[in-house]
């Protein structure tokens, strides 16, 4: 089982063929060699967390189709875009608002934020083809990259890998991670990071244009072209609010996160915001549903067959004599910097999360705290390379930031992340006392 799992993960990383195809081949081999039977293998496709991911993909399509995501972004630019730093904060704010209902940070960064940043940059004659990328474009691109990763770490439903981590935590350490306890643990360090990181980037990599008085006029013109808010956008706002409320209070009224997502999608279909063709055309959701289900099934089998517990105890014994805080820090640092070998955050979570969580728990670390910290860093570790995750190649390929600059600044910001204890301490203090 382990050999097939490793082979599948390597295939997901190197992608000699699409990740879904690699997963199907791995699934077939698992049954063919007799590790498990077909009935057991297909159980992964009934996992509620995986269906939550698919439903949230469909919901996020509503933001794009109705134009609501773009309208929100333009409103932020209109209100806060008089200075370049304020412009960056406004864009990060939009990402923050959209994050809870968008399980693809690639969709947020590439489908909504990147077109806005490109248009803004061009309006200030900031173009890498003309050698003027440093005017505003470089700063906005790099700030959005880091802001996107932070917002992805703040909400359970903001990145597909978070929901995989939730599932693995339940199966590996019997830790029940909910939307609410993830949010409560992440909110303070997340907000602090969203305030501090753009300012640090502003000092490290300052734009040559500090004032952007024309941004407000540009945004107002774009909003005028969009016209008044449409009925479909109003429905989208209403459904989004209902989904957020149910994600927050659902555990108290017997409505879990997956059912909430199904309710939201049903409302979007009933109101006509989305039609069935939209659902069928959301290939990212169906693709994720297939390969995620296979990887979760494999990881679950490794745990049931005793491999993950054995590996966790073996590594924990090699770290014998160290206190659990030291062990957890070592594991997080290893988790973070090993991402240089990965081109997908979700693939990295699939490969290492369960084993590292098992080691932390065996070493005596609080299970929920360990699960959440590794969950957060499953997003933050993508702040390493220009191929680290879906948003990275999209933003890097625009040409506003060179590869050398991208790597060096990420290295510096990564060091800052570990030398500043306050966000981690605050996460610890905000952690719910029970799972």
Predicted regions and their residues:
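Generic alpha-helical transmembrane segments of integral inner-membrane proteins
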Residues: 6, 28, 93, 97, ...
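Alpha-helical transmembrane segments of multi-pass membrane proteins
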Residues: 85-99, 125-151, 177-185, 324-337, ...
């Amino acid at each position: 089982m382990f050999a097939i799992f490793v082979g599948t993960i390597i295939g997901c990383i190197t992608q000699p063929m699409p990740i879904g195809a690699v997963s199907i081949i791995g699934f077939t081999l698992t049954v063919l060699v007799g590790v498990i039977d077909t009935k057991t293998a297909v159980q992964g496709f009934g996992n509620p967390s995986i269906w939550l991911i698919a439903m949230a993909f469909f919901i996020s399509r509503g933001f794009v189709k109705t134009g609501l995501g773009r309208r929100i972004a333009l409103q932020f630019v209109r209100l806060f875009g008089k200075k370049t730093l304020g412009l960056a904060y406004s864009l990060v704010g939009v990402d923050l608002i959209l994050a809870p209902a968008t399980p693809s940070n690639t969709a947020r960064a590439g489908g909504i934020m990147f077109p806005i940043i490109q248009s803004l940059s061009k309006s200030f004659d900031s173009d890498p083809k003309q050698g003027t990328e440093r005017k505003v474009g470089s700063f906005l691109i790099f700030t959005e990259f880091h802001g996107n990763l932070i917002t992805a770490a703040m909400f359970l439903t903001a990145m597909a890998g978070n929901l995989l981590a939730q599932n693995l935590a339940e199966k590996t350490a019997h830790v029940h991670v909910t939307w609410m306890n993830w949010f409560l643990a992440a909110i303070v360090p997340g907000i602090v990071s969203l305030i501090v990181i753009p300012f640090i980037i502003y000092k490290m990599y300052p734009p040559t244009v500090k004032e952007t008085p024309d941004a407000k006029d540009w945004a107002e013109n774009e909003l005028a072209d969009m016209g008044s808010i449409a009925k479909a956008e109003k429905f989208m706002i209403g459904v989004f609010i209902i989904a957020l409320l149910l994600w927050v209070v659902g555990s108290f009224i017997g409505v879990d996160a997956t059912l909430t997502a199904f309710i939201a999608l049903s409302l979007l279909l009933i109101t006509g915001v989305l039609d069935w063709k939209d659902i069928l055309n959301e290939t990212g959701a169906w693709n994720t549903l297939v390969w995620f289900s296979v990887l979760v099934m494999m990881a679950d089998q490794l745990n049931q067959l005793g491999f993950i517990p054995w590996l966790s105890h073996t590594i924990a014994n090699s770290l014998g004599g160290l206190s659990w805080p030291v062990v957890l820090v070592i594991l997080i640092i290893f988790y973070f910097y090993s991402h240089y070998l990965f081109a997908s955050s979700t693939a990295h979570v699939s490969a290492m999360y369960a084993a590292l969580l098992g080691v932390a728990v065996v070493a005596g670390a609080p299970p929920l705290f360990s699960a959440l910290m590794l969950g957060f860093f499953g997003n933050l570790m993508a702040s390493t390379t220009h191929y680290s995750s879906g948003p990275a190649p999209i933003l890097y390929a625009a040409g506003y930031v060179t590869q050398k600059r991208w790597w060096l600044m990420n290295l510096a910001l990564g060091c800052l992340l570990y030398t500043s204890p306050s966000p981690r301490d605050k996460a610890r203090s905000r952690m719910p006392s029970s799972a």
